[in-house]
């Protein structure tokens, strides 16, 4: 069993772009997007994964993630709720920490979210100047919620 502890933030500006170390294209869908549990299928440039996540409590939840054959993932994505989530993930190494910046495309174009994974819920994080409002506890920003209420519909 794994435990995922992460915090999510909006971005204030584009200063983060000068810190990019890596980028990856991601396509993902949800076989189940219930608030109590999600079952996600994800393909990246290199791998395919199936992930089961439990309900979020504060900033943590149980997470089980397994690599699966790419062809299986492509077939499973056809069974997922729509729209699929499409995004580019940028890896930022900043002051000894790894940040993931997701730039959403398609139905969620215009949305940018920064995430940082932690070892403990009470772990202190020094926020870079480009980090804006924290949205860790706002369910609208869960990827599984973005398939039901895409960002383009928020306006």
Regions from the language model: what does each represent?
Residues 1-155:
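Phosphate-end processing signature that detects enzymes handling 5′-triphosphorylated RNA
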